[in-house]
């Protein structure tokens, strides 16, 4: 991106939004910090998407309910994966934050 490189686990782009997705086997608090750094780098290095909302998403197989609450407070989507079930967690009052 503009001569700068960094790795994203996954990126989804729609007409009016971008979703930066971190995929982890075990969620750790540092994963949120990493996601936020990736969002900032993406915003700086993709002027073609400057008018799009940017959302953060973390996907993990190993997590606890406190992780879901913490991410919800930050406005970050959380998706869990177990066996053959994929679930988007949106606790009551969840408001996704757009960067």
Question: Which ranges hold each PLM region?
Answer:
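Short, surface-exposed, polar/charged, turn-prone segments marking secondary-structure boundaries
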Residues: 23, 39-41, 47-51, 83-88
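A general structural motif
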Residues: 17, 51-53
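Charged, alpha-helix-enriched surfaces in structured cytosolic catalytic cores
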Residues: 5, 30, 66
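Domain-level recognition of nuclease-like catalytic cores that cleave nucleotide substrates
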Residues: 54-99
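Short secondary-structure boundary micro-motifs
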Residues: 9, 53-54
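Conserved catalytic cores of phosphodiester-cleaving nucleases, focusing on short active-site segments
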Residues: 8-31, 35-36, 40
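A short acidic/basic microdomain associated with nuclease active sites
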Residues: 1-2
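Short, charged, amphipathic alpha-helix that recurs within catalytic cores of restriction-modification
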Residues: 31-46, 56-60
């Amino acid at each position: 991106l503009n001569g700068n490189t960094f790795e994203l686990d996954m990126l989804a782009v729609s007409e009016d939004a971008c979703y930066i997705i971190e995929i982890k086997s075990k969620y750790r608090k540092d994963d949120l910090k990493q996601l936020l750094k990736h969002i900032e780098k993406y915003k700086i290095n993709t002027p073609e998407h400057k008018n799009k909302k940017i959302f953060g998403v973390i996907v993990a197989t190993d997590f606890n309910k406190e992780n879901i609450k913490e991410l919800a407070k930050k406005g970050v989507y959380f998706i869990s994966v177990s066996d053959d079930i994929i679930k988007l967690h949106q606790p009551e009052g969840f408001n996704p934050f757009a960067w």
